[in-house]
């Protein structure tokens, strides 16, 4: 359990002296006594790698040296007969590096003793255990001091900012697990491409792909698979996966495996019959152009905001060339007309969570990429069939200007003003080329920032049109 040991050591260097309280996930029931597959809370896994529910951890830090105390389910022969083996307290010490381990039923009583002498306490405010137990215990463990100017001896901090910063930079062991998740996901996508044909159903393609994930060692899906044929490719988080695949249409698959708790996140869009139409090819190549530009920018010289801004510019040029917008590139950007066809971000952090921990800003400024960061790059163009004619508002909606105004006026007041301006704005009506309606294309890869250049962890899954057609045919 070397990864969590290293993580605790990194946390201890930040905390220096204090205590960290962190809680694992509970079993979640689907109905009656049938439960969902258990997955550990990512922050708890990061610090302990503990795989069982209903666990707590207290990390005592003295002079930047961490000491792990675990509270876990007891060994219980009867319960293990029903639900499987339990690791128990001895296993927590021998296998997971705990200095001492207790029954989870002892948490409230032992926490008081463990916290004695510690006044810097780091907690997970979002945890129900913090709200139900920790807050009450802290008043007893670190008593109020009304003799001096300070009302309490305890300084309570959120552990989330520390963990988010640490999780943002992947260590070598984490990158190995993430690469394995990517490799498994690639094979699943290839299986789907080879399997797909007109007349199949979306769920059949999903089954073929997910079978490959599990066959190659995935513990679970990174997220619910999106297998979106035809018009469904224009639905960003489509997850019904029940419709029949039509000849001449596209299939957009956004799906990935999770391995060692780390998730990949890949999207490919390919022809159901193995051959792109000229219109599909035109849209696809524009998205690919934008993605290639974005991938090249994942270096220590750029920020996520700069990547997104460049992607918007590329997509906007494409929308003009494809005849999807009524004005030029400058107006398409400044009036946010591109948002009708590209309405999401260009990327997000990737790791233990598919939308992983970490902020795009540092000290209220856009954050530069740093070695060890992993992001997706996933531009798209979605020509929704439900909008053959679009009324575009003729009003400046530059995101940077809106951001400044929101800071000056406050979010609520600025949002109300924006809505009012949109309602009162003049519009220009534009008819969308019929041959493009229902075409949705997204291409998504997983990109590692290094000291020198970006590394595409999912490069082995083809993006080139000829390669894709060869696989699908």
Task: Give the role of each language-model region.
Residues 1-473:
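Active-site neighborhoods and metal-handling regions in enzymes and metal-associated proteins
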């Amino acid at each position: 359990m070397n990864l969590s040991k290293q993580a605790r050591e990194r946390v201890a260097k930040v905390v220096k002296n204090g205590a960290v309280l962190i809680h694992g996930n509970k079993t979640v029931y689907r109905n009656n006594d049938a439960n969902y597959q258990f997955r550990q809370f990512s922050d708890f896994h990061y610090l302990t790698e503990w795989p069982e529910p209903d666990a707590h951890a207290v990390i005592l830090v003295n002079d930047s040296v961490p000491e792990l105390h675990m509270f876990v389910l007891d060994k219980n022969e009867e319960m293990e007969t029903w639900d499987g083996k339990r690791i128990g307290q001895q296993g927590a010490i021998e296998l997971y590096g705990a200095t001492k381990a207790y029954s989870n039923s002892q948490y409230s009583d032992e926490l008081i003793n463990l916290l004695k002498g510690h006044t810097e306490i780091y907690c997970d405010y979002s945890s129900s255990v913090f709200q139900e137990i920790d807050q009450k215990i802290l008043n007893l463990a670190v008593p109020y001091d009304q003799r001096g100017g300070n009302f309490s001896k305890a300084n309570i901090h959120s552990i989330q900012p520390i963990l988010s910063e640490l999780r943002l930079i992947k260590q070598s062991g984490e990158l190995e697990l993430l690469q394995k998740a990517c490799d498994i996901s690639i094979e699943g996508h290839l299986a789907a491409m080879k399997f797909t044909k007109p007349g199949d159903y979306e769920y059949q393609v999903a089954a073929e792909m997910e079978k490959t994930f599990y066959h190659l060692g995935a513990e679970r899906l990174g997220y619910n698979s999106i297998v979106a044929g035809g018009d469904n490719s224009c639905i960003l988080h489509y997850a019904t996966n029940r419709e029949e695949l039509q000849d001449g249409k596209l299939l957009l698959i956004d799906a990935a495996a999770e391995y060692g708790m780390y998730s990949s996140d890949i999207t490919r869009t390919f022809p159901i019959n193995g051959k792109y139409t000229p219109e599909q090819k035109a849209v696809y190549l524009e998205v690919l152009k934008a993605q290639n530009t974005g991938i090249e920018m994942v270096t220590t010289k750029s920020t996520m905001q700069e990547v997104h801004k460049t992607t918007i510019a590329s997509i906007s040029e494409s929308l003009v060339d494809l005849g999807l917008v009524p004005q030029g590139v400058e107006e398409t950007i400044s009036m946010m007309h591109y948002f009708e066809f590209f309405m999401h971000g260009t990327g997000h952090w990737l790791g233990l969570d598919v939308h992983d921990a970490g902020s795009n800003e540092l000290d209220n400024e856009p954050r530069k990429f740093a070695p060890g960061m992993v992001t997706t790059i996933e531009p798209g163009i979605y020509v929704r069939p439900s909008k053959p004619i679009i009324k575009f508002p003729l009003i400046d909606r530059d995101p940077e200007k809106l951001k400044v105004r929101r800071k000056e006026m406050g979010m609520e007041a600025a949002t109300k003003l924006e809505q009012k301006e949109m309602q009162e704005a003049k519009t220009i009506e534009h008819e969308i080329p019929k041959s493009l309606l229902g075409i949705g294309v997204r291409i998504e890869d997983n990109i590692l920032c290094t000291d020198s250049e970006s590394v595409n962890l999912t490069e082995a899954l083809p993006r080139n049109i000829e390669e894709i057609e060869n696989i699908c045919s």
